[in-house]
């Protein structure tokens, strides 16, 4: 039977909504990957009595309590003292931890204060969990088959402690080997879930879907007697998803679509440029987040004004006047012009209405046109985001542009596009046909 867990986030600022709780999401996924069933997520304020009552109740529900937050030096940082008491433990001063704190303050040009000594208190019967990235050590307590692990609330410190210390500790307690891999899949969650539903019901390996903007992750986890067997099980199960989804599965174990785009461009000796209007450089930013992007990406044009579109990437002002700046012909000329100006093999373009104002009956807010040029052709697509959320519209547009770039880098035709020859980019009949076809979608 698998271990059960509860994630407990401590901090009044979380209850007030002043801080977004990203720790709970991260830990839920990490625990699931270890085969540990998360029964509940809870948020508790900085109050000793309420926290103690909650801990004693949670011990009856789960094998493992995972805490984040409340390990600081101030009077309202109560997690360590409270959990220690609930687990029948006490705390003692650790000179080594104190010296680390003193050294940290010295490096940053500050002086310690008496309340900083609080962070150097560690369990007597349990053990400390070393924090290599901050001043607050974590803690591990055990009593009557129940465990509690305490980690800092600062996300980067918590993640580092989890990866370096807590995850290996939990793995060592498992009586089997676990292996996970993550498939990155283009498309929405509801359609994907419908297509792969039978594969989500198997107990081992398990598969879970996590929704992102314009794509999903499928995390596959296998439990076996040894790591080799677990890897083999994961690989075989992943093949079932590939068989169902085809090239909608674009990669495995990558941070995002931009990473795959950059790697594919590098593998094929290709370069890319961008011409962005409503996304304002988001595509370029995502590409340059990837190490090694400088080998494939040299030019990014942010052409917010109509004059910029004409001056930087050669859009014909007459085309803007006839078809509107948010149109398929403009997206086509932006992509072709960016490729030419940058000397790039591939270029993507975006022009759209992110709102909240500016829309009309023909082009409501959420209307976006995208172009992707390679060689003597440009592929143009219309995207409509029905929810009038500026951030979402821009994010979806950037994601779609990267998807189109990936398909061109793979030598494929981007789905849902209309093609225009480079030689026809100034042909009134061809531009009108392109405009009418995509406006009708």
Regions found by a protein language model. Name each.
Residues 10-12, 67-75, 152, 223, ...:
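Glycine-rich beta-strand-to-loop/alpha-helix junction loops that act as flexible
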Residues 2-41, 228-232:
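Glycine-rich phosphate/diphosphate-binding loop of Rossmann-like nucleotide-binding domains
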Residues 229-441:
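Short alpha-helical segments enriched in small residues
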Residues 28, 32-57, 93-134, 308-345:
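Glycine-rich oxoanion-binding loops at beta->alpha junctions
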Residues 50-53, 77-173:
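Proline/glycine-rich low-complexity loops and linkers
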Residues 5-7, 148, 272:
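Conserved hydrophobic helix-helix packing surfaces used for dimerization/oligomerization
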Residues 142-214, 219-221, 229-234:
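Accessory alpha-helical/coil subdomains and C-terminal extensions
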């Amino acid at each position: 039977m698998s271990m059960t867990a509860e994630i407990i986030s401590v901090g009044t600022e979380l209850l007030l909504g002043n801080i977004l709780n990203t720790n709970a999401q991260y830990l839920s996924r990490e625990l699931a990957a270890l085969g540990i069933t998360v029964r509940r997520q809870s948020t508790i304020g900085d109050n000793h009595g309420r926290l103690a009552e909650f801990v004693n109740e949670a011990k009856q529900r789960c094998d493992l309590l995972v805490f984040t937050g409340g390990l600081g030096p101030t009077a309202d940082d109560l997690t360590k003292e409270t959990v220690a008491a609930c687990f029948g433990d006490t705390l003692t001063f650790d000179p080594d931890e104190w010296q680390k704190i003193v050294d940290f303050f010295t490096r940053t040009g500050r002086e310690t204060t008496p309340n900083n000594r609080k962070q150097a208190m560690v369990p007597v019967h349990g053990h400390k969990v070393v924090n290599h990235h901050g001043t607050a050590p974590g803690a591990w307590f055990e009593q009557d088959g129940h465990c509690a692990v305490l980690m800092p609330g600062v996300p980067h410190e918590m993640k580092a402690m989890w990866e370096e210390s807590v995850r290996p500790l939990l793995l060592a307690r498992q009586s089997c080997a676990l292996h996970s891999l993550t498939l990155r899949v283009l498309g929405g969650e509801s359609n994907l879930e419908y297509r792969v539903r039978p594969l989500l019901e198997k107990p081992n390996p398990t598969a879970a879907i996590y929704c992102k903007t314009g794509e999903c992750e499928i995390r596959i986890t296998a439990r076996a007697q040894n790591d080799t067997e677990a890897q083999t099980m994961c690989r075989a199960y992943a093949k079932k998803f590939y068989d169902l989804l085809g090239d909608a599965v674009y990669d495995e174990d990558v941070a995002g679509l931009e990473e795959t785009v950059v790697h594919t461009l590098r593998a094929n000796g290709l370069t890319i440029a961008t011409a962005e209007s409503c996304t304002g450089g988001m595509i370029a930013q995502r590409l340059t987040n990837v190490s090694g992007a400088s080998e494939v990406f040299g030019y990014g044009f942010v052409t917010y004004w109509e004059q910029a579109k004409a001056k930087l990437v050669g859009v014909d002002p007459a085309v803007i006047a006839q078809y509107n700046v948010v149109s398929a012909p403009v997206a086509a000329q932006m992509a072709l012009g960016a490729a030419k100006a940058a000397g790039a093999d591939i270029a993507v373009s975006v022009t759209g209405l992110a709102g909240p104002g500016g829309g009309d009956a023909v082009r409501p807010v959420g209307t976006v046109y995208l172009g992707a040029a390679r060689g003597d052709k440009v592929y143009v697509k219309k995207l409509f985001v029905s929810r009038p959320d500026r951030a979402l519209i821009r994010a979806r547009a950037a994601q779609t542009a990267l998807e189109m770039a990936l398909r061109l880098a793979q030598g494929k035709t981007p789905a849902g596009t209309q093609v225009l020859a480079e030689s026809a980019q100034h042909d009134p009949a061809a531009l009108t046909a392109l405009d009418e076809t995509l406006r009708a979608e």
